[in-house]
Each structure stands twice: as structure tokens, then as C-alpha cells.
Amino acid sequence: VKDLCLEPQLFSLLEGKVKYLAATPRFKDVIQTFAVPAGETPAGFRIESTLQEDGLLLIDLVRDISYDKNGVKRPTGILYSADSANPYEVAPIAPLLANLTCNPGIVYDLFINNPKANVGNAFHTRDEVMTELGRILGPGCDISVELNNPFEEDFDKILEECETFKSILSEYRLVVKVPHTGPVNPNNVHELLEGDKKLSTRYDQASTADALRGHNLALRLREHGYRINYTLMFEPYQTAMALQAKPYFINSFVRHRAKQSSA
């Protein structure tokens, strides 16, 4: 942090008051986690400073994907996200992304089990794919990974899955993707995978518990320190309720609903 440049206004405020300079434990952890070259701070973090009463100026790194490396803002206020789990597809656009999202269908059906995409069958597990995506995207891009089974009754198993994500991507990049479940529940989810793949329960016939299953799961995971990407909503009005689950991101597939309505 000794080479950190301060804005003139901040320098004027601190001049004569700072006796010591130090980095926070999080600052050090970020640098070590991403093996940042000397003299740099990584993309995806803004630099914050706090002056203590004893004259100690603490320098911290706070997660913020609107920042490029060395505390410089990205060129525009629009942040780009991609929906893919194909490392070969992601690599060319990686420097331009602030977020990546994927779900089990994208990971397994469109990539791992697709010989045209998974060239030479190089990848066999989701963990291998996530590791490679993390390497390609670097520290500046959040990665939203959807739970394999949001209907899992054992919450400890869901936490175990999230811990695996965190060990691969780090707590700084991981965003857990939780779907709005609507009328789908553990007893009828198989209908979406069998036969005509249509659900026998209408969207407006969901029980209260089923309709809010995703919301409550998102809240529980947030209480355990995870950032949440709340997804799979098709109506604008659903966003207001989703905000009650305190997500980090919201994915509303309004375009799908609009297309269906105009068909």
C-alpha cells in the first residue's frame, strides 16, 4: 500500500493526521487469494481507507465489480454478464465481463455432456468446469453458480455444496444462484424431466410454502454469509417480493414472458 495514490482532496484531509499506514487483514487475504503482482490491486475491488483515532490509516479492499484493477472504475456504468459454462466460449469475452451466471442445465447439458462443446471430453465434473472458469475470468468477475437441487430437504447438504463452490471460487467471487420455485416442489419436480415435461400444477395454484421456498432458501443462505443471485422469475411484479429475500442480484426473464404473450 505504500505506493497507493491518494486523491488531492483526500490527501488534504489526511495531511498531518496520519502517523502509521497498514493494510487490513482482508486486504492481505485478497492479495494472497488471487496472487496479485506486486504494486497492484486486483480488479473487482475498490480501495477504501479508514483513519483510526491513533493516527493509523487502514487500507482495505472491498468487493465491487464496477472497479477494474488498481482502484480504477470500469469505463461505463453498464456491467456486462454472460450466461455460459463453456470455458472456450467465455475466454474471448472474459476481459469485458463483470459477472458470469450458470445453472445445472448449462453446465451439464450444454457443456459437459455435449461432445461438440466439451472438446476431447476434457472436462468431467462441474468442479473442473468452475475451476477453469475462475482461472479464465480472474478476480474481477463474480460467478453465479446455481444449486444442483434447490429442493434438497437437508439444508446442511446445501451448505456443503456452497462450501465447495467457495473453496473453488473464493468468497469474494461466489454468488449462489437460487431459483424462484413457484408451484414446483420436491414431489412434482420430476414432471419437468419426464414425458411431455409439463407441470401438472398451474403457476397460480402453488401452496404458500412452495411459492416461497426459493425466497426462504435465499434468506437462509444469506444468513450464512452467501451473496445470492435470485433467478427464474417471469413477471416484473415478482421482483418486489424477491427483494424481500435480500439478494445481491435478481434475474427476471421478462423477455421470455413477453415472447410467450405475443406468440
Stretches with model-predicted labels:
Residues V1-G77:
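Long, compositionally biased, glycine/small-hydrophobic-enriched stretches that function as flexible linkers
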Residues K69-G71, E89, P95-L96, T239:
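Generic structural signal for short, flexible, solvent-exposed coil/loop and linker residues
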